[in-house]
Every structure is written in structure tokens, then in C-alpha cells.
From Swiss-Prot:
This is Protein translocase subunit SecA. Keywords: ATP-binding, Cell inner membrane, Cell membrane, Cytoplasm, Membrane, Nucleotide-binding, Protein transport, Thylakoid, Translocase, Translocation, Transport. It catalyses: ATP + H2O + cellular proteinSide 1 = ADP + phosphate + cellular proteinSide 2. ATP binds at residues 90, 108-112, 504. Its EC number is 7.4.2.8. One of its GO terms (cellular component) is cell envelope Sec protein transport complex. It is found in: Cell inner membrane; Cellular thylakoid membrane; Cytoplasm. It comes from Gloeothece citriformis (strain PCC 7424) (Cyanothece sp. (strain PCC 7424)). One of its GO terms (molecular function) is protein-exporting ATPase activity.
Amino acid sequence: MLKALFGDPNTRKLNKFQSLVTETNLLEEEIKKLSDEELKRKTDEFREELEKASNDRELEEILDEILPEAFALVREASLRVLGMRHFDVQLMGGIVLHKGQIAEMKTGEGKTLVSTLPAYLNGLTGKGVHIVTVNDYLARRDAEWMGQVHRFLGLSVGLIQSGMSPEDRKKNYACDITYTTNSELGFDYLRDNMATSMAEVVQRPFNFCVIDEVDSILIDEARTPLIISGPIDRPTEKYIQASQIAKQLVKQEVEDGPGDYEVDEKARNILLTDEGYKKAEQLLGVKDLFDQDNPWAHYIFNAIKAKELFTKDVNYIVRGGEVVIVDEFTGRVLAGRRWSDGLHQAIEAKERVEIQQETQTLATITYQNFFLLYPKLSGMTGTAKTEETELEKVYNLQVTIIPTNRPSQRYDLPDAVYKAERGKWMAVAEEVEELHQKGRPILVGTTSVEKSELLSNLLRQKEIPHNLLNARPENVERESEIVAQAGRKGAVTIATNMAGRGTDIILGGNSDYMSRLKIREYLMPKLVKPEEDELAVNVPSLGGKRSRPQGFASDKKVKTWKASPDIFPTELSEETVKALKEAVKIAVDQHGQQSLGELEAEEKIAIASENAPTDDIVIQKLREVYKKIRAEYEIFTSKEHNEVVELGGLHVMGTERHESRRIDNQLRGRAGRQGDPGSTRFFLSLEDNLLKIFGGDRVARLMDALQVEEDMPIESGMLTRSLEGAQKKVETYYYDIRKQVFEYDEVMNNQRKAIYAERRRVLEGLDLKEQVLQYAEKTMDEIVEAYVNPDLPPEEWDLNTLVSKVKEFVYLLQDVAPSDIEDMTFMEMKNFLHEEVRKAYEVKEQEVDRVRPGLMRDAERFFILQQIDTLWREHLQGMESLRESIGLRGYGQKDPLIEYKQEGYEMFLEMMIDIRRNVVYSLFQFKPQGQPQAV
């Protein structure tokens, strides 16, 4: 009804922005006439204009005014440097991002190029722009590729990668535009708030952030806290014993039936029954699992969770004797990440690998609260509309759908649902075989490593050649190579969740990528230092045979850089091979044999494959030969492109509905990019997880009613509705969990902001002395309030204890006696002690500074930071325990969240009091050595 009256809100928004696009287009001819130097001069003119702003509001207004000209400038620079011109819909996307909204753009519509527009415009302010991607590879690719446009226009471009030194991080964060990943950004923030001097702080205050694959980070990752932890000692034998006990405990199959524990798959939790408690206590030979001196409950719960809820090759893989988490959304391994609260150790005990030390949280924040620290936030994704409510409620981000540049020609075929899982997989293999014979490229999405290997075995039996892309290390190495060829005629690719895989699937094959791969093959062995080959490892494959990971020699840990020969559509002509060898020789003459790091050499190839102006002779030669190779490959790929289009384009097959419709849409979006033809179909079974957990009894009843063979597809409106309903239920369920996480974390967030602001003030050394004096005065006030009740007559005041308490904190006040204060009022006592403590502090300062001038300031900084860090760490644990126990309050008709807020606030106030008192006590007790020394 409202839509009919007012029109679609998305269309209204787009119409509003259309005038800016028109204005940008009108400037195109004028900007085209400018020389390279004149284009660069425009950047200085814009900066001068922005300097006139006296506050943030005026700055935003000027940015809005110069937007059309700045966008026209970026469009022209991009055309000159990369050979890529922004379409009108990409300009529209850029406007949406600059306005601090989310731009939903379909796969293949050039999201990466869109980000150059708001990044340049906001980068002009000099306050820093962060472009955030999901992994190091994409951050590096975009910094090298899109960064050329910014560098050409005179802005500095930084890149943050894991393993980088603090000095390099600081330098890269100081750039106008910095490319990084969400985890590096979050961990740097936490580390900065654990720094002991300003020299260790690497980030500047946050300004503007553009998140690529925004839904993946703000929604899928929202429940994942970033944690920096330190080791704590817990006996590893307890994990092993608990794992053995868990094996002997039996799962309860029906509600209130026999069994030792019940499993709540929805909440991913387990509950011991009364029998379970008794049995576990009996097997352990203890009276109580919750005994404070010898607690076992924590270990037993985790061991059962490890047994029932965490499956090998689905939730994790075992690699090199370590349990490595697999990200359920991207299908990638999360190297270096561990489950907390002893869960990882329980899984290590289950898999019989070495149990690593448990850790204690030192600093933590969720992505939800981290990204809310930015004054202006925006993001891009192919799929955000389904989560619009959450993005708007939690992050205050509107979603705008950007139309595609060409109309979509993708056909989404109806789901094929099978009664049993076996029937489903047979049908998938048959459809692959049928389409493969016609020569259509096929992409099959699976939800786990285990399922992808099951299908791979079926296809092997049918002798269908295929590529496998999942979290196993031997496959990860070839990721871009596999995706780049997934659109070739007859190609079959099996991939675990396609989220965040940054290479486009181009019908007929990606000639640009093939050409770069060929140059890499010749150039890298001659140019790269051998010790750079950190990735060169051999990994045992399935079946005990040792497979050779792509690009590695079979017996030595040395990279060969050779891609598999079937990647290339044709052999190169002799003339081109000769030119390639000459270009490599020039590179070696210029840089020396095996002299460059891997990243430097990769960067040379990346720049050579673009059109950025360069004086580097090596890049010029590589560019000439790149164009020759590409021209030869393109003869074949363009012919193949037309053949594949004739056949109907890429066919995408889903093999299970994901918990989120968005992830399904991401998979579908791989077909029919940029107006190409394509089709998609989902193959499902009534035994799939989603239907088992959320489909409920309706589906079970339907199964019994349908007397069909397991290999016959069922098509039923009720079933499709059940599926849609199940997915919506899951989405709502997880949204509620995320909302709850957010509400609880909001309490921690306010405390975190307060403690980090206090810490930063101390680091910057602002009025440290005054701060400590205020701490001391407040402590004196608290002592007076504890021993003097103004409502009672003075003879009942406990002045002796009061005075001895004062001396306990400040030994320099030994001369103060009860008689000094007995005739004073409550307020007079406070004022008297304020004066005394200030005098005592002056004496202390002179005493300390005699050892080394300025030592007192260092001591103040050291003691305040030490107390903040130690007590904040304990507070984090206290809040975690409070949160675990607070859920039980719900049974007592109290709102757990309100209780948590109240008690959490009281705990925080107590911590602040302890920090204050401990600092005062430590500083007055501090006795530096006789010679100069640093604290």
C-alpha cells in the first residue's frame, strides 16, 4: 500500500543520487583534456578547499560539493592507469558509500573499482580511510591494483598484512588510504590499548571505513569476539580424562528418555541429566563436579561438546598434529584462531594430538562494537537486503540496491528435493555428468570439506575431471587458479562456500590471470629469494599417499612456481617465449639473481598487467610481453567464451540450503555475471541439517507420507515453503542471538571505552601528576567516609582507625595524629587530608626526582598502566563468569540483562576504586635505587 503511494524507497534514493551522476558525466569531457600533471594538481586544489573547513560538519559539506568533480577525476585516472572506466551504476555505488550506507552490488559488477571513488574523496582530508577486506590476499591485491589510481593522483596508499612489524604498521596507517583485513584492524586496536608508550601505538583516530563483503564481517562474524590472550596453567591430564569419560556417557535420544546428557543442536549446547551427573562423578571418583577445589564440570561439558557438536572435516581439520578451525561461512581455515574456554583443548584431547596451553583473555572486542567506533562507516556486498533490518538497527546502516549494468540473464531453476541424502548426491553427480558432456562449465557449492570430498569421489568413479576447492592446504594454494578457470568449457569445480573468494569466474577462462601465471612461472624462480618460500610444504593427502601441492617440487621444500599445464589454453609461439625470456633476463640484470622478496616480485607482475604509467624498465618489458601472451591466449578464450554462452553459460549447483539465504544468494550470484547467461539449481534432501534442526515435525510427517524412492525428486509447494520458513526461522534465531550478544557486549563496550580513554590519557602523559593527586584525594575521602558517620555524635567517630588507615596508604603522613582532626567537621577533615596528601606528594616527588629528573612522571605512568591492565584483565574474567551465571536469574522472574547491567556496573566501579587505591599505595611505597634507573 505505502509502496503504491510513495514509490519504492530504493528507487527514490537512486533518483536522488542520479543528479550527481549526471553532473559527474557532464564534467567528463573537460577532465579528459587535462594532462597527467594537471590531473594531479587537482588533488592539491581539492585539499586547499578542504582546509577552509573549521569543523567536521563543514568538512562533510565541502566533500559533498566537490564530489562530482572528484569522481570524474578518479574515473579519468582509472581509465588512464588501469584501462577501466567506471560505469554510471559504479558512480552510483560510490555515492552510496560516501554517504555512509551499504551498496548492494551483484557479483561481477566491479565492487573493487567502486571503492576507489569514496576512498579518494575522503582520503583528501588526510584523516585516513580504511578499506577492509576479508583476507590478506585480497587486501594486497586491491592495494597493488586499485592503489595505482590513488598514487597516480598523489595520495599515499598503505597496506597492513599479518606478520608486519609495528614500525611498518605505523607507517602504513599514516597513509591517506590503508588496505587491510578486519582481523588485523581489530587486533591492532586491542594491541594499541595494551601499549606502554605512545611510540608503540600504530593506529590514528578512526575516520572513514569501507568494508568489502560487509555482510560477512558485520553479520556472519558478529558473534566472534577478537581476543588477545596470555597463557594460564591448567592440567592437561584433566582434558584427556574428561574425553575418556565423555566416550562412556550416552546421549539421550528422546526427551525424558534414558541417557546421560541431552544435546541442543539449535543452541549448540549440552545438558547433563541427573543420571549423567551421577555417572560422571562415579567414573571420576569425586563427590561433586562443581567442587571449587577440584572442579570437573567445565572439562566434562567441553568434552561432550567436542564429541557431539564438533565434527572433524566440517568444523575443523587436523593438520600437522594441530586442530585448525574451518570458517563455516567461507570454507577457509582460520590459522592461528582457537576456540576459547578450554573447548579447543577438549577437541585436541578427542583427536589425540598435543594439548596446547589454555589462555586467559587480556583484551577483547566484538566486530559489532569495533566498527561502531568509526564516525563514518560504509560497505559493499552482493547480498545485504535479506539482513537489512539488522544492519539498520545495530549499525545504523541503510542498504541501497544498485541496479546491474546489463540486465540479468540468469535462470534459477526450482529446487530438487530428495528423501534421502544418498539419493541427492547421486542426482548431483548425474546432472554434472549430463552437463559436462555438453561442455557447460559447472560450479558445485558444498557446505563442508567432508561433503566436497564425498562428491569428488563420486565424480572420480564417473571419470569426470574436476577441481576441488576447500580448506585443505593443498587446495588453498591453487585457489585463484581454480576459480579463474571455473568458467572454461567443460570445467567442473567443487567449492566449499564461495564467500569472499576474490577472483571472478569469466566464461571461457580468465586470459588476464593465465597471462600473469605464465609470467610468474618464468620470472619467480629467477628473481625470488629461496628463503622466502615459507609456504613450500608437503602435505599428506587422503588415503595416506603424499600428494604434491600445486607449485611445489615433490621431495624438497622448494617452490617450482609451475602451474598445472592444463590451465593454459595453448602453447605460446616461439617468438613470445623468446620475448618472455628476454624480459626475465632484463629483470635479473636489474635486480640480481634471486634477490627479491615474493611480495615485491608479485607486485611487479601485478603492475605490469595494468596500464599505470611507469619509468621502471623491468615493468615496461614485462608489460610488453604480458600483452603478447594475453593476445595469444585471448584468441582461444574469446572463442571459448562464445561457445560457452551458446551452451547457456555457467551452471551453479547448491547441495544444501545454508542457514542463511544470503550465502545461498552469494553462490547463485556466481552465475550470470555482467549480463552473461547462466542457471542455478539447489539439490536438497530431507536429511539435510537445516531441515533436521529447524524444519521440525512437519517435514518428518511429510517424509512418512511420501512413499517415494530415495532417488526420485519430490516437488511440493508445502516443502518449498517449509524450506523458506526454516531458513527464515534460522535467520531470526541467529539475529536474536547476535542482538543478545550485542546488548550484553554493549555493557562491556561502555566500560571498555571508559578504561581505554583513561589509558590513552595516561599514555599521552597529560597531567599525570594532577591525576594521581585526584586519586589520592579521592582515597582520603573514602577513608573518612568509611570511619566517620556525620549523623553520629563526634565522640562515636573512630578517628584512631581512620588515622592508621591514612598512614597505611601514605607512610609520609606518620606525624598526623587523631588529635589533629578531632575538632574538625566531616568536610574539614576531608580538606585537611587533601592538603596533607598534596604536601606529602611534593616531598615524594623531590625524593624520587633526585635519583633522575623526571623519574616521578615515568613512575606515575608505569604504576597507573600496570594497575589498569592487571585489574581490567581480572575484570574481564569476572564479567565472563557473571554472564555465564546470570542466565539462571531468568528462572527467578528477573530480567537477566538488567541484572547483568547493574552488577556489571557495580563491578566496574569497584575496579576503578581498586585502580585508584593501588596506584596511590604503590607510588608512595616506591623507593628507587640510589643510581639512575628507568622504571
